[in-house]
Each structure stands twice: as structure tokens, then as C-alpha cells.
Design a protein with these regions (language model features):
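Short edge-strand/loop segments of extracellular domains
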Residues: 118-119, 166-173, 229-235
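Double-stranded beta-helix
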Residues: 8, 156-215
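Short, conserved beta-strand element in jelly-roll/cupin
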Residues: 137-158, 197-200, 228-232
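Generic beta-strand structural signal
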Residues: 106-113, 123-125, 145-151, 161, ...
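Active-site glycine-rich loop that binds ribose-phosphate moieties when present
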Residues: 129-137, 151, 181, 185-189
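Non-heme Fe(II)/2-oxoglutarate
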Residues: 2-12, 61, 203, 210-278
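Short acidic/polar capping segments at secondary-structure boundaries
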Residues: 116-122, 132, 153-158, 169-172
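Non-heme Fe(II)-dependent double-stranded beta-helix
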Residues: 1-30, 35-138
Length: 278
């Protein structure tokens, strides 16, 4: 489902009551929601240019981030954690946070700021979920405890490798994280997957347990996508997210705790990777 966010909602920095209910219901039932055109395009353009340069650095390094621990052509690649590339409408978007706080409650925190790049010629990932269930063997499973906030830089079409999503699978609490072909084919007969196509400025929010996979990028463009992960406040916290001093202002109005530390000196953000809430 996609919600067309109005100019009035953008001005008020929150969704209307009806749109908020649709967003929350969609995440509970389908496992995801797309919020339309809530990130300014000029910020995405600046990030896209920098992240494309960084992609070439990763590829030329012959790092396993290029060959991929999962699939060739899908890079683990974070956005630069320093000014002028940190924007409040990305790291603390008020519309996104309105959804996250309503869904997860006050005290929700961010445990991840990184991303991935789907490069031209990539192959299909294995079907997977980003986290398991807190309590196993519940069907339907427990309510959402964490969401991934995906922010692409460009229009993401099927040709450009739009993510494959399996609606409703976040509730299958009696299925382990190891999703083999038999599990996949059984679910396909019940409800087939959809493609999470988005327009520039859209944001995709999905339950971390939702089955999904990266698809082949058949275009000649890199598809960069930033990822944050918002957690319910009572979960244990990992290490703070590292940013470089000079961008603190971007977080001043954040309703979701940024769980951030601001370093005096830059660090090797392309190769010093930390997983979600680690």
C-alpha cells in the first residue's frame, strides 16, 4: 500500500488521522507501507552523487562488500555520516517518526544508519528476513517491534531492482529464519510476492521480519538506498550510531531517539560496518 502524503501533512509534520491509521494497519497486516514524496529531491540528489562515487571506491577495493556475503552486485554501503550529507528529513523525518512512534510507542530508538546499493548486473538474493521473532512458534506472531526505514535516492522500478516483498509473512511466527525453497514455494501458492516500486522522495517502512529479497538490477544505474532501523524502546540497545561532529543540528527535533554519538574525527564508514543494533 502507498499513501499519498499531502502538502498540508508535510507542513504540519504529521499524517492526518485517517492516513496514520492506514499506515499502522498496513504495517500490522501487510508488513509494510510506502509514504509518498516526503523527502526533498535536492537532498537525495546530493547523496546520490556522493554514494555513487563511494560505490566505485568499494568495487575497486575488491572487498567482499562488492562480491557480497549474500549475492553479487548488492553492496553493503552506508551514507556518509557527516555534513553536508546529513539531513533532518532523512535521519529524523517527522512523517516517518510519526508512524514509528505511533507503532512502537514513546521511547523508540534508532539502531542503524547504513544502507545498500544494487549495482547494474546484480543477481537475485535468497529470500530472507532481517530479524527473527522475539517469541517463536506464535502464529500469528507478536506485534511489530522493529521497522526498517528504506529511503531510495531515485525512482525504483522493477528494471532497477525494486525489492521483492512477501505481504503478511511477518506474522508467520512458526517459520524459522532459514527460508528454503520448499517454504518459499508453499507461501507463493498462498500469496505471491509483490515488488516494492517507489518514486523519488518516497519512503518504504517495513517490519524487519517481513520476507523479502533484493532483485536483479537490469538498468545501467546504481540504486542506492539508505536504511534506518527503529526499535521499540524496551529492547536492549547496541552501540550508539556514529556520526562526525558538525551535524548534530539535524537531530534536534527527532521524536525517535537517534541513539547517536558524534566523533571528533572521521572514520572509515565504507568498510567499518556495524550491523543493526550491534
Amino acid at each position: 500500500m502507498k499513501i499519498k502524503v499531502s502538502s498540508e501533512e508535510l507542513t504540519k509534520r504529521e499524517l492526518s488521522a485517517s492516513h496514520l491509521k492506514k499506515a499502522i494497519d498496513a504495517i500490522h497486516e501487510e508488513g509494510y507501507i510506502i509514504l509518498g514524496n516526503i523527502v526533498p529531491h535536492n537532498h537525495l540528489d546530493l547523496l546520490n552523487e556522493k554514494m555513487t562515487q563511494d560505490s566505485h571506491t568499494i568495487v575497486s577495493s575488491n572487498s567482499d562488500r562488492w562480491e557480497g556475503r549474500r549475492t553479487i552486485g548488492h553492496l553493503q554501503q552506508g551514507a556518509p555520516p557527516f555534513a553536508p550529507y546529513i539531513f533532518p528529513d532523512i535521519v529524523a523525518n517527522p512523517i516517518v517518526e510519526h508512524v514509528s512512534i505511533t507503532l512502537l510507542g514513546e521511547g523508540a530508538f534508532n539502531g542503524f544508519y547504513n544502507g545498500n546499493t544494487n549495482t547494474p548486473g546484480s543477481t537475485q538474493q535468497n529470500l530472507h528476513m532481517d530479524t527473527g521473532h522475539l517469541w517463536s512458534n506464535l502464529n500469528p506472531s507478536h506485534p511489530t517491534a522493529s521497522v526498517v526505514v528504506n529511503i531510495p535516492m531515485i525512482d525504483v522500478t522493477e528494471e532497477r531492482g525494486a525489492i521483492e516483498l512477501w505481504p503478511g509473512t511477518h506474522l508467520a511466527g512458526d517459520v524459522s529464519r532459514r527460508l528454503d525453497e520448499a517454504i518459499e514455494e508453499a507461501q507463493r501458492k498462498v500469496r505471491p510476492p509483490v515488488r516494492g516500486t517507489t518514486k523519488k522522495g518516497d519512503v518504504l517502512i517495513r517490519d524487519m521480519r517481513l520476507w523479502h529479497r533484493g532483485a536483479p538490477n537490469l538498468s545501467d544505474m546504481h540504486r542506492h538506498m539508505i536504511a534506518l532501523v527503529h526499535y521499540v524502546g524496551w529492547l536492549c540497545r547496541g552501540r550508539p550510531i556514529r556520526y562526525v561532529k558538525g551535524c548534530e543540528e539535524a537531530f534536534k527535533n527527532s521524536r525517535v531517539d537517534p541513539h547517536a554519538t558524534f566523533l571528533d574525527e572521521p572514520y572509515d564508514y565504507l568498510f567499518d560496518y556495524r550491523g543493526p543494533n550491534s
